[in-house]
Amino acid sequence: MKFEEKHRPKTLDEIIFVDAYVERIVKETAANKRHKHLILHGPRGAGKSETANLIMKGRYAEEDVNIAKCSVHASALEDQSLDILTGNWNYQRAFGMLHGCLVIEEVDQLKLGMQQTLRAIVDEHTFGIIICTTNNLHRIDQPLQDRCRCLEFTYPTVDQWLPRAKAILDTNGIFLTEVQTQLLLKGFEGSGRKMMDWLEDTILDFTSNKSEFDQLLEVRTGT
């Protein structure tokens, strides 16, 4: 199994939210307390796609719904009718769902005409919600934005990464103190994908030559 897949967040509690308000809206939507359309926007690797799919799974955790039918990339929608949206919602409601739910990845890749059609569909059909992701909020039709709650995702700081990074290191047999882990991550800036690369490198350094890793750790952490 790929390292990134092995340590992919399994629940929303494993997602690192920079903004407490965003965390609240996300978790309340996943718990079926909110039913407004969402646009998760921000830079690549900020956790938007993981969050969108975990919201969807949270809404249907107790139901027998094929999650694979609930997520689509915008580029795939360019080659077919947006009827897939209401079709998926109806499929989900056939299993007893009050509201259908579909994740649309990179929704900004829809041409303007398709975005306007999408807006008309969500206006007409109130029995489902869409959860969209984008790296480019400015490319999304403003009236479509107005029908959604737009939540901004940004990169966590090293301090915010600390608990998750330490847990991953622990799982792989590298037991460091919080101070050591923080110093090990010193200087890191970047996305969740870059963090996974960083941690994988650290773990491979440890497993390939523990003595050299210990020396590296002493240099990097000052221990």
Residue ranges and their predicted role:
Residues 20-23, 66-100:
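Short glycine-rich substrate-engagement loop in P-loop NTPases that contacts/grips substrate
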Residues 1-43, 87-94:
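Pre-Walker A (pre-P-loop) alpha-helix and adjacent loop at the N terminus of AAA/AAA+ ATPase modules
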Residues 199, 203-223:
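Conserved C-terminal helix/linker of AAA+ ATPases
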